[in-house]
């Protein structure tokens, strides 16, 4: 009997503390965390694990630099703290990556002002990454000779993080961790209905 079939059998008539519907990044992380703490966890997904939003990311794990434009400081702070936590918790999966923005006369911000924003972003993130830099056109040429600097005023360089492997594998790592902790996980299973009876939820699922 294959792994999926064995997990389908466990779902049939099984009693669980938690049923997680959806095996994307949120469901997978929740399952791994709960199962590791001894909860009886079941995870289902109507498609494959990480088959929808969680496999259509850019692999970027960022702190929300763009949101500084709207002065959403708390949001940026929360995103930076989450990014930092992920880098520390999964050093083999997440790495720091440098970004460079080249700015000309038509850019909305001058290099010095963009540099102030990048520095604020770094400070809000507790200085966890390498510090940002304001770049002259000459520095941009040294770093990236392919970039034309004829009309550039300068640029900035700052850091965020990215998933080294693809996003789907990152998600499935949490599914595997949940399985190893005793969770029941089955893909291509849809949630049909649920009703409360005898102090418990009875759930009807369908093997698709």
In which residue ranges do the predicted regions lie?
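Glycine-centered short loops/turns at secondary-structure junctions
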Residues: 22, 38-40, 182
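N-terminal Rossmann-fold NAD(P) dinucleotide-binding loop
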Residues: 27-28
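Glycine-rich FAD pyrophosphate-binding loop
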Residues: 35-56
């Amino acid at each position: 009997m294959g792994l999926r079939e064995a997990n389908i059998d466990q779902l049939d008539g099984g009693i669980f503390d938690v049923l997680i519907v959806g095996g994307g990044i949120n469901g997978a992380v929740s399952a791994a965390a709960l199962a590791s703490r001894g909860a009886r966890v079941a995870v289902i997904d109507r498609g494959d694990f990480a088959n929808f939003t969680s496999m259509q990311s850019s692999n970027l794990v960022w702190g929300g630099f763009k949101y500084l434009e709207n002065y959403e400081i708390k949001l940026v702070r929360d995103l930076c703290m989450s990014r930092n936590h992920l880098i520390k918790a999964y050093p083999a999966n997440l790495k720091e990556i440098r970004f460079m923005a080249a700015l000309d006369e038509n850019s909305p911000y001058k290099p010095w002002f963009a540099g102030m924003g990048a520095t604020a972003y770094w400070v809000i993130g507790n200085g966890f990454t390498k510090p940002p830099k304001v770049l002259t056109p000459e520095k941009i040429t040294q770093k990236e000779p392919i970039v034309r600097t004829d009309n550039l005023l300068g640029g900035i360089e700052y850091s965020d993080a990215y998933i080294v492997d693809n996003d789907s594998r990152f998600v499935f790592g949490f599914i595997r961790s949940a399985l190893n902790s005793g969770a029941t996980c089955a893909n291509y299973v849809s949630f049909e209905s649920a009703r409360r009876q005898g102090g418990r939820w009875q759930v009807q699922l369908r093997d698709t």
